[in-house]
A protein has these predicted regions:
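A short coil-to-beta-strand element that immediately follows conserved catalytic motifs
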Residues: 87-92, 159, 265-278
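Flavin-dependent oxidoreductases
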Residues: 17, 171-258, 262-271
Length: 336
């Protein structure tokens, strides 16, 4: 019997995790990853690797919670497994502060969620009017991408370094196409609902920082955050929709450092390791995860538009892609 062929387009955390999960759950499929950018040059590489739904739009928030739950459970597994050291996966506890009361739907997914009292706010960040404490997971995304690629190749996955102009170029060679191109979908399939949300972060050496701290003001974006990663503390950040600038902006750098030092004064003398900027793939209408019919009856499964929640949703979305493929294609291939 001929093996059905799958091509996953895109090699960030969404693309690689999707390819690996297809291999895991559909072992009779031949899987290829095709991309023109690989780690360490993907947007995912600069991510803080922090699990929390962030800058993800749309009305399908029930699915965001479902995908987020599946991903968080998987990350908790990695953080408590022997793989934790290799992946920089760790459970982290800390505070999220706000300028007004919040009731996030994801509060039931994290561990130990509680609203903080006025004493904690006054002691830690008096400018805030509301706060919460909880435990979540962080992962070193560069290490994670390397591990995913190793797993993919070990499972006989094919890797092609190339750029395509349209998905239809792949229909002759592949039975299933999975579109994980992120911001690239704007040009590749003419989806102008995909827009960049520019993110800039600074990484510093601050091994004394053990708790994360975030602050969200009235603009609706996380104005500043401090995330204690495995190799550095990540300071952020920006959420500039429609900004295509991939250079490090000095004003943003100043805002990040000053804002984070206000939250945690001990960072004032921390050594700066590097600055980074990336463009998050945001869709106002929400994550696009659905199938579409192409020429000759071939189907593409779209999986893009995760905004600032790529790490937060990746494994759950990969599982949804597998379900889409299994439902749409298994009956057809039984006749080959």
């Amino acid at each position: 019997m001929k093996k059905p062929r799958v091509c996953v387009v895109g090699a960030g955390v969404i693309g690689l995790s999707t390819a690996v999960r297809i291999q895991n759950e559909l072992p009779n499929y031949d899987v290829t990853v095709l991309a023109d950018r690989f780690s360490p040059d993907t947007t995912s590489d600069g991510s803080g690797g922090f699990w929390q739904p962030h800058l993800v739009g749309g009305d399908n928030q029930d699915m965001v919670i479902q995908w987020g739950r599946d991903t968080l459970n998987y990350l908790f597994y990695l953080a408590t497994s022997p793989l934790a050291n290799r992946l920089g996966a760790q459970m982290v506890s800390g505070y999220s502060f706000f300028s007004e009361p919040q009731c996030p739907e994801w509060r039931h997914l994290v561990l130990g969620y509680r609203e903080v009292d006025s004493r904690e706010i006054k002691l830690l960040f008096p400018r805030a009017r509301f706060g919460m404490f909880y435990t979540t997971v962080m992962i070193h995304v560069k290490a994670y991408l390397s591990w995913l690629m190793s797993r993919f190749k070990h499972n006989n996955g094919n890797v092609i370094d190339a750029r395509i102009d349209k998905l239809e170029d792949l229909v002759k060679e592949y039975d299933v196409i999975v579109n994980c191109t992120g911001l690239g979908a704007r040009k590749l399939i003419n989806d102008h609902d995909v827009t960049p949300i520019r993110g800039q972060v600074t990484r510093v050496k601050a091994p004394w920082v053990k708790l994360f701290m975030t602050y969200q003001g009235t603009h609706g974006h996380c104005e500043n955050y401090i995330l204690p990663g495995a190799d550095a503390v990540v300071l952020g950040g920006t959420g500039q929709e429609g900004n295509w600038n991939t250079g490090v902006d000095d004003e943003d750098r100043k805002m990040i450092l000053e804002g984070c030092v206000e939250m945690m004064p001990s960072l004032k003398e921390a050594e700066v390791v590097r600055h980074w900027t990336g463009l998050r793939p945001h869709r106002t209408s929400g994550v696009r995860l659905e199938t579409e019919r192409l020429a000759k009856g071939k189907l593409v499964v779209h999986n893009y538009g995760h905004g600032g929640a790529g790490v937060t949703l990746h494994w759950g979305c990969a599982g949804q892609v597998v379900r889409e493929i299994r439902t749409a294609f298994t009956p057809n291939f039984s006749r080959l």
